[in-house]
């Protein structure tokens, strides 16, 4: 098991699934990555570090990566304001936001439908990785 202590919710997404272990990792933003954990990530030797944040989010909290890891950094921005727009639209329309789960379900659907080119690129990168790790993240990891 990979232990990254300085980044929120760093985890292997294969846990509990039929995916191969230790290939695909998800976490919150990497701006808090400390020196110890930078070395851990370097030792993983990931094929790619994919950042789904938009430029405004990156500007506020850039990933703390070594030059070795920066070479593997890929930004595939997905608008973080999508969820905010959805909640605001529900309020404007007079709808009641029934539950957190429903809003998240709708936002995930919108993330897919409104950013097909990003997801296409993401899956292309996964196919090219040839058994090397991929780390992906957004701002806060849910």
Name each model feature, range by range.
Residues 1-135:
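Cys-dependent protein tyrosine phosphatase-like superfamily
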Residues 134-142:
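A contiguous pocket-lining binding segment that forms or flanks enzyme active sites
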